[in-house]
Swiss-Prot record:
Record-given protein name: Ribonuclease J
Protein family: Belongs to the metallo-beta-lactamase superfamily. RNA-metabolizing metallo-beta-lactamase-like family. Bacterial RNase J subfamily.
Lineage summary: Bacteria, Bacillati, Actinomycetota, Actinomycetes, Mycobacteriales
Keyword DNA repair appears in the UniProt entry: no
Biased composition, class Low complexity, residue ranges: 55-91, 100-118
Function text: An RNase that has 5'-3' exonuclease and possibly endoonuclease activity. Involved in maturation of rRNA and in some organisms also mRNA maturation and/or decay.
GO biological process, one term: rRNA processing
Residues where Zn(2+) 1 binds: 220, 222, 287, 309
Binding residues for Zn(2+) 2: 224-225, 309, 536
Record note on quaternary structure: Homodimer, may be a subunit of the RNA degradosome.
Length: 718
């Protein structure tokens, strides 16, 4: 995303006033239990919704993977919110932000598909019962209502993103009506979300309560932990943000793109901060980015440990290992609840050290005869430092490519996290003019992103660099699930050119920033928590993490498996699931946030996969009879299919004549019948499911010439 595009984006609706009836009760809890009457009404509505639910509504990726059925009500939940590896029939539903329901859009929108889901009702769940699976302990069948009133002197915890998925991390802690937020990141869209730039946490449940937020604490500077901060600040711009030096620098740069000046407060591993009822102590954590912090959050309800993203690298490049002694001291104090990184809980053993990568890079770069291009995550300063050291040892200059890489390395060099001899780092323009064996390029594009620098090089579309036979390409990163096709596509294009591509499968050019199961056991044994809540992972990771906690002595009933929106209350030293709030996705699309829902994504997918058929029929407004033959236009069809569109025209004409013979002259009902018949015909004939867009225009028999304005006006009226 370029700078101008970022600056142009805006929040479509700012934080609104308190809920109706609460104007004079600003200290009411964020969530309250519905009264009995509203509960009964909600149950009835839910039952009706289940009876009429579209089959696709029941698909929820993560729970399907566990063999459990989805018990969510179609009226207030979105499908497939828990698994990144989803098909087009198992897409996440978006949460609308327009404050009004759109359940009837499928019927009222003349251009919509006939059998689409409806049901996004805005961010508030007022009075509705949100039925989901309970993920507490081994119980996967209990249905959860909306949570009751927050317990007095109890700690409430819920995630608005980042649990049951990897990305858009955001966890809220609530004590006595005050809120503390930990992290605020983004998730990047999958192929099932066309046209979406970013996916944000759902701010809806706290949007009207942001005045109660005492601070936003950020564990580290990765996009899935800081990327949504500018969007949150558009709802309240003075939230204090606590983070380490390097993390704050990345946040400041990101907010500058949005023309924001956030309230930034620097902390480190020795800091001890009081924010409202929350006492926050910090401890050093090792990850794949500098200055990571773990949290120890203390309230009268107890002590909570949040690991953030963590690994146990015993020989870290910066000499700053994860502070296990500090974690052990917290354990001596008594840890009531531990939120632990689950990303690599399914991988046995321990992860490798970043120090193990440096010798491999030095050898590969030293042996290379032509240009070397290394692709890495733009925030992995340690990896970039190892690459720069390898280039210096081989008498090569280094150039950074990719906007995020250039920005992050400028920050890292300015703050002293990246070190290179004077004159080593040069511009891309200078690099393009040098002999290939004298240059090393460090670029973005490890995941095959179409517009990333490495992908453009592979397609030979890069403005400054042309990859040649004999060049060495090092992919120094992990392969994110779901990106395999894109990454292998880039590798194949580079191989076709004649370049040599080295990945983590070929040599030790990458190590994970997340601890394996053996490292998580160390964490649990050091902290000795009474309760555990796995976070930062998909369901397979969360369940594996649960078993690790149990193996170290945590009572099975005290391990809480939650997904986004599940509310956990910690009272008297026991953490329990008490309900769930509606949490969906906020999509950033162009200049807006949140105006996309499941229907829009379904339309975009149908357009991309099935094409478009547009039918315009002009009828006598009294008799309903056609005044001229229907006009059919198509988009996205092959020439062979277009040649058969005469059949579509004939069917349209027959359908309209039959309806008129039955006395039908209502354009809306005619549109519905026409769409239904054409959809069935096209699917049977060509095995396609295009967007069918019929338009029926009522006119007097004397007026048969129809202009574009009349067609447009008729579509809008329908």
């Amino acid at each position: 995303m370029n700078d101008s595009r970022n600056r142009g984006r805006k929040v479509t609706r700012k934080a609104g006033p308190p809920e109706a009836g609460q104007e004079n009760h600003l200290d009411t809890p964020v969530f309250q239990a519905p009264d009995a009457s509203s509960n009964q009404s909600a149950v009835k509505a839910e039952t009706a919704g289940n009876d009429n639910r579209d089959a696709a509504q029941g698909a929820q990726g993560s729970q399907d993977s566990q063999g459990s059925q989805n018990a969510q009500g179609s009226q207030n939940r979105e499908s497939g919110n828990n698994n990144r590896n989803r098909s087009n029939n198992n897409r996440r539903g978006g949460r609308g932000r327009r404050g009004s329901g759109n359940a009837n859009e499928g019927a009222n929108n003349n251009s919509g598909n006939q059998n689409r889901q409806g049901g996004n009702r805005g961010n508030r769940g007022g009075g509705r019962r949100n039925v989901v699976k309970s993920m507490q302990g081994a119980d996967l069948t209990q249905r959860l209502p909306e949570p009751p009133k927050a317990p007095a002197n109890g700690l409430r915890i819920y995630a608005l993103g980042g649990i049951s998925e990897i990305g858009r991390n955001m966890t809220v802690f609530e004590y006595n009506n005050r809120l503390l937020i930990v992290d605020c990141g983004v998730l990047f869209p999958s192929s099932g979300e066309p046209g979406v730039d970013l996916i944000l946490p759902d701010f809806g449940p706290i949007e009207d309560h942001l005045h109660r937020v005492d601070a936003l604490v950020v564990t580290h500077g990765h996009e899935d932990h800081i990327g949504a901060i500018p969007w949150l600040l558009k709802l309240r711009n003075d939230i204090p943000i606590l983070a380490s030096r390097f993390t704050l620098a990345l946040i400041a740069a990101k907010c500058k793109e949005h023309r924001q000046r956030p309230k930034l407060i620097e902390v480190n591993e020795q800091s001890n901060e009081d924010r409202g009822p929350f006492n926050i102590r910090f401890w050093a954590v090792n990850h794949s980015i500098p200055d990571c912090l773990g949290l120890a959050i203390k309230t009268p309800a107890g002590l909570v440990i949040h690991t953030g993203d963590i690994k146990l690298d015993q020989t870290p490049p910066d000499g700053r290992p994860t502070d296990l002694p500090a974690l052990s001291r917290f354990g001596d104090e008594g840890v009531d609840l531990m939120l632990c990184d689950s990303t690599n809980a399914t991988t046995p053993g321990v992860s490798g050290s970043e120090a193990d990568v440096a010798p491999t890079l030095k050898r590969l770069v030293g042996d290379a005869k032509q240009r070397v291009i290394l692709a890495s995550f733009a925030s992995n300063v340690y990896r970039v430092q190892a690459a720069v050291d390898a280039a210096v040892a081989s008498n090569r200059k280094v150039a950074f490519n990719g906007r995020s890489m250039i920005r992050n390395m400028e920050i890292a060099e300015k703050l002293g996290y990246l070190k290179a001899p004077r004159g080593t780092i040069i511009s891309m323009d200078d690099a393009s003019r040098m002999a290939p064996h004298k240059v090393m390029l460090i670029t973005t594009g490890t995941q095959g992103e179409p517009m990333a620098a490495l992908s453009r090089m592979a397609r030979r579309e890069h403005r400054q660099i042309t990859v040649r036979d004999g060049d060495l390409i090092i992919l120094s990163s992990s392969l994110v699930p779901g990106n395999e096709e894109a990454v292998f596509g880039v590798i194949n294009m580079l191989a076709q050119i004649g370049a040599t591509v080295v990945t983590g499968r070929d040599a030790k050019v990458h190590t994970s920033g997340h601890g394996y199961s053996g490292e998580l056991l160390f964490l649990y044994n050091a902290a000795r928590p009474k309760n555990a809540m796995p976070v930062h992972g998909e369901w397979r990771h969360l369940r594996a993490n649960k078993e690790l906690a149990i193996s170290t002595g945590v009572n099975r009933d005290n391990v809480v498996l939650a997904q986004n929106g599940v509310v956990v209350d910690m009272v008297n030293g026991r953490a329990q699931v008490v309900g769930q709030i509606p949490v969906g996705n906020l999509y950033v699309d162009g200049v807006t946030m949140g105006d996309i829902d499941a229907d829009i994504l379904a339309d975009r997918t149908s357009l991309g996969e099935g094409g478009l058929i547009s039918i315009t029929a002009v009828i006598d407004n009294r008799t309903g009879r056609l005044l001229e033959r229907p006009t059919v236009q198509t988009s996205g069809f092959s020439e062979d299919a277009k040649s058969m569109m005469g059949e579509v025209t004939e069917l349209s004409e027959t359908t309209m004549n039959d309806l008129a013979a039955e006395g039908e002259n209502d354009p809306y009902r005619m549109v519905q019948q026409l769409r239904r018949k054409l959809s069935r015909f096209v699917e049977q004939k060509w095995k396609r499911q295009p967007v069918i867009m019929p338009t029926v225009i009522p006119m007097t028999a004397e007026t048969t010439h129809i202009g574009d304005d009349e067609v447009r006006a008729s579509r809008e009226s329908l």
